[in-house]
Amino acid sequence: MKNALFLLTWLLLSGCKPTPKPIEYGADVCAFCQMTIVDRQHGAEVVTKKGRVYKFDAIECMVNYVAQQGSESFALFLTNDYMQPGALTDATAATYLISRGVPSPMGAFLSGFGNEPDARTVQTAKGGDLFSWSALQDMRQKKGFL
């Protein structure tokens, strides 16, 4: 009886831990624009403090969604690393490039990078401007969209 109670308690507690889930490209649908997520370089994901996962086909969709919902309820913010297609990286620590030379699914020309040197390499080749997570939030707040 004690073992069953322990197991049930463990399952309940572990089930609520905010954990990312892999994006299923070609199957998952964007929580913001409802498009099917297919681009492995520009996808994104947020996880609520209760463990619910929302996936996005573009970083700009995630930024707009978070702005509409309020960031307080989210535990994790993740973005695809442009240099490692399909790999998710911490969106709050990522470096972002807005460059007309690198189109993104929703037309904001926004790409995320797991580290600044990679972002600078692509910036040198394609042009554009670099931003931090907080700078993207500020830009979205000033414009009303991204």
Question: At which residue positions do the language-model features occur?
Answer:
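Post-signal-peptide N-terminal segment of Sec-exported extracytoplasmic proteins
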Residues: A31-S71
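Bacterial signal peptide processing site
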Residues: K17-T19
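A short, exposed loop/beta-hairpin motif centered on an aromatic-Gly-Thr core
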Residues: A108-S111
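C-terminal partner/receptor-binding element of secreted or periplasmic proteins
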Residues: G114-L146
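Mid-chain, structured segments of secreted extracytoplasmic proteins
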Residues: C61-G101
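Sec-dependent signal peptide recognition
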Residues: K2-L7
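C-terminal motif of bacterial Sec signal peptides marking the signal peptidase cleavage site
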Residues: L12-G15
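Short metal-coordination and nucleic-acid-contact micro-motifs, chiefly zinc-binding Cys/His arrays
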Residues: G26
